[in-house]
A protein has these predicted regions:
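Active-site beta-strand termini and strand-to-loop segments that position acidic
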Residues: 38-44, 95, 168-169
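Helix-rich C-terminal or lid/interface subdomains of diverse kinases
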Residues: 191-266
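An alpha-helical support segment within catalytic cores of ATP-dependent transferases
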Residues: 6-17, 119-158, 166-169, 173
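A conserved alpha-helical element in kinase catalytic cores
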Residues: 9-12, 32, 44-87, 91-94, ...
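Regulatory N- and C-terminal appendages and interdomain linkers associated
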Residues: 1-18, 250-266
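Active-site Asp-x-Gly
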Residues: 168-208
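Activation segment
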Residues: 53, 98, 163, 172, ...
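ATP-binding glycine-rich phosphate-binding loop
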Residues: 6, 14-41
């Protein structure tokens, strides 16, 4: 352990679940968490994800992740324990031997990623997710009619990026279910398209990969067009609000490329 890790009170909170501690290795993932780490311990190892116990979206996302976990295992690592006090809220997941996926052109990981995304699309919507309506793209839609195309009864993972797909020996997991929602089933494959274009694929190639997901095949092309337009407006808005964030400008360019490919209104 090192000085950047939480103090003794944090580890005392975890002790009933971990037993005696060994090494603690911070992970590169977890940009929205106060701590993500592999904790070597008497009862582990565990992947530990922790946030300060303050009211708001970040705390709520951890609670949502805990609530959805039983319904997404074995596509996600199982949650083994939870701990909470006035200062911290902590989740302990089964640690898996895996690495982040590679989305670049020619990556051997893409078959596994698309296969897993297809399996996620087949999951039934759990009761806990009934009230988690997907609305993030609604205000960027042309109108209420287009926004209604994003509605649906599918369980959406929505946080599609290479670091959230973990490639193991003969297994692939989707991790960081921080903000699952209920919406139109095509949205997850559409988010994959955006990420693949960002990784260097042409829009045509990216959509060919998405076409391996039944939810994409079954989607109304007009709904996908409306989403591509809204997605571009969303990233354009984000980039305008944070002009120094080069990655947001890059995502705007990516979204523009895909929208242009579809001939979608911008």
């Amino acid at each position: 352990m090192n000085d950047s890790l939480p103090g003794a009170g944090f580890w005392a909170l975890l002790n009933p679940h971990t037993g005696d501690l060994g090494d603690v290795h911070r992970t590169a993932r977890g940009f929205s968490s106060d701590l993500t780490a592999i904790v070597e311990c008497e009862k582990g190892p565990f992947f530990v994800k922790a946030m300060r116990n303050r009211l708001g979206g970040r705390r709520d996302s951890l609670i949502r992740e805990a609530r959805v976990n039983p319904f997404v295992v074995p596509l996600a690592p199982p949650l083994k324990w939870q701990a909470e006090n006035d200062e911290w809220i902590v989740l302990g997941f089964e640690a898996v031997e895996a690495r982040g996926a590679k989305f670049d052109v020619g990556s051997p990981d893409l078959r596994a990623v698309v296969g897993l995304l297809g399996r996620i699309g087949e999951l039934p919507l759990p009761g806990v997710a009934e009230g988690w309506a997907e609305t993030r793209w609604n205000r960027f839609a042309d109108d209420a009619v287009d926004a209604a195309l994003f509605e649906g009864g599918a369980l959406l993972y929505s946080d599609i990026n290479p670091s959230n797909f973990m490639i193991g020996e003969g297994r692939t997991w989707a991790v960081d279910w921080s903000w699952p929602t209920r919406g139109a089933a095509f949205i997850d494959p559409a988010c994959l398209v955006v990420q693949l274009v960002a990784a260097g694929h042409s829009p045509e190639d990216a959509e060919a990969w998405a076409g391996r997901c039944p939810a994409w095949v079954d989607a109304d092309p007009r709904a996908i067009d409306a989403f591509a337009s809204a997605n571009l407006r969303m990233y354009r808005s984000f980039a305008e609000r944070r002009p120094d964030a080069a990655w947001l400008k890059a995502m705007e360019t990516t979204a523009r490329s895909w929208a242009a490919h579809r001939g979608a209104a911008v």
